């Protein structure tokens, strides 16, 4: 049997379509344009294809993480076949000054965690300034973002492990100073 280019193209096309429908497909990224309804409804819909391929892996609460490392837990809302970022979404949007016309790129990491890159209306990635978020003291690895007001009380608060780390750094500095003083004494004696 002679295989022609058309036969190869049809076979490739069929196998490509089958791999796209595979529920184990590695679709990990999607983007969303922030529409007026997103801001008005205070929730954002996850694209249907992503839901079809990855929706069963998502727990009731997901974590959004920005490139600056800020994390926010968002409760999902399931309506029929649709899944929406819901409770916590409007606070995340407000904390990052997300507005109509912004473009968001979501990358699913695992364990219901998404990395979110935010592009503003100029089509450039937004800055993620520290003073645009409100960090709540927490003993776990999740830093909660709650709004634009960043008061000095929370600025000065540290998690217990950060306080412990500061103590260790202080002890290392003290030991270094003592070591340098001892070396200076040896040089003067010697």
From Swiss-Prot:
Q: What is its main location?
A: nucleus
Please indicate if the UniProt record lists Protease as a keyword.
no
Q: Which SUPFAM superfamilies match?
A: DNA-binding pseudobarrel domain
Q: Report keywords, A-Z.
A: DNA-binding, Nucleus, Transcription, Transcription regulation
One GO MF term, please? DNA binding
The cross-references to SMART domains, in alphabetical order and at most eight, read: B3
Q: Which GO terms describe its cellular component?
A: nucleus
Keyword Transcription regulation tagged: yes
One Pfam family linked to the record: B3
The compartments listed are: Nucleus
Q: Kindly give the InterPro entries that the UniProt entry links to this protein.
A: B3_DNA-bd, DNA-bd_pseudobarrel_sf, Plant_B3_domain
The segment annotated Disordered runs over: 1-25
Write down the DNA-binding region ranges: 29-122
Give me the stretches of Polar residues compositional bias: 12-23
PANTHER family according to UniProt: B3 DOMAIN-CONTAINING, B3 DOMAIN-CONTAINING TRANSCRIPTION FACTOR VRN1
Q: What is this protein called?
A: B3 domain-containing protein At4g01580
């Amino acid at each position: 049997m002679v295989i022609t280019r058309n036969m190869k193209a049809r076979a490739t096309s069929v196998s490509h379509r089958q791999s796209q429908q595979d529920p184990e497909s590695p679709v990990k990224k999607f983007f969303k344009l922030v529409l007026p309804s997103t801001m008005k409804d205070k929730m954002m819909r996850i694209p249907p294809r992503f839901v079809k391929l990855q929706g069963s892996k998502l727990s009731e609460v997901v974590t959004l993480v920005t490139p600056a490392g800020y994390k926010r837990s968002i409760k999902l809302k399931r309506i029929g076949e649709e899944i929406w970022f819901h409770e916590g979404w409007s606070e995340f949007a407000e904390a990052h000054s997300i507005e109509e016309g912004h473009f968001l790129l979501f990358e699913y990491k695992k364990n219901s965690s998404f990395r979110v890159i935010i592009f503003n209306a100029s089509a450039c990635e937004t800055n993620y300034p520290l003073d645009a978020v409100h960090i709540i003291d927490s003993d776990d690895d999740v830093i909660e973002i709650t709004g634009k007001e960043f008061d000095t009380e929370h600025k000065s608060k540290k998690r217990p492990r950060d306080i412990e780390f500061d103590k260790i750094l202080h002890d290392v500095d003290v030991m270094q100073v003592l070591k340098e003083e001892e070396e200076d004494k040896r040089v003067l004696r010697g």
